[in-house]
């Protein structure tokens, strides 16, 4: 099963400083529980068109693991709802995260890529 890489360009909300965003991610998102088969990474542009801008990289073990929680774009499964009910600290961190730089929303520029060769 090929790995899925979800790339999400992040634009910080007005008043959110990059250092604040990085600190929040490191202290609240990175240690939070994730749905099984998922890893989340915060990247910052160092060269190129998005220098200084953030990108969230979701590393998902397979298309099936993605679709288990998000069967269609913008649609959450009952299973992901239960996961966040069982992990309220992760739900609270995600809610705060979305206020800082919308992620997984209509304002999010994103694409899921499936590994075709490694």
Language-model regions, residue ranges each:
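Short, flexible turn/loop "capping" segments at secondary-structure junctions
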Residues: 1-4, 48-50
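Short hydrophobic/aromatic beta-strand micro-patches
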Residues: 11, 57-59
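Short, surface-exposed ligand-recognition loops at beta-strand->loop->(often short) alpha-helix junctions
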Residues: 11-23
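An amphipathic, aromatic/His-enriched active-site/gating alpha helix that lines ligand/cofactor pockets
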Residues: 27-41, 49-50, 59-111, 115-118
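Residues on conserved beta-strands of the protein kinase catalytic domain
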Residues: 52-54
